[in-house]
């Protein structure tokens, strides 16, 4: 009986102490399940328990991989 009371007290008091590390992940670990999305987040799916899967919005622009290196010797013209 003492063990039961001890475990109950531990789980009861640790339940509110959850942080973002223990949040349920969604969208292949890029998103997080929460009740509402932040300003810079976008709703992309629904999680269990009526939660929303929110992903941080990426800024528009060119990726570094898309830019051509001028020193690479690559020319678009023939000859």
Swiss-Prot record:
It comes from the Eukaryota. Disulfide bonds join 26-53, 33-47, 37-54. Pfam families: Defensin_beta_2. It is found in: Secreted. Residues 1-20 form the signal peptide. Keywords: Antibiotic, Antimicrobial, Defensin, Disulfide bond, Secreted, Signal. One of its GO terms (molecular function) is heparin binding. GO terms for biological process: defense response to bacterium; innate immune response. Its main location: secreted. InterPro entries: Beta_defensin_dom. The keyword Membrane does not apply. One of its GO terms (cellular component) is nucleus. Belongs to the beta-defensin family. Has antibacterial activity. This is Beta-defensin 15.
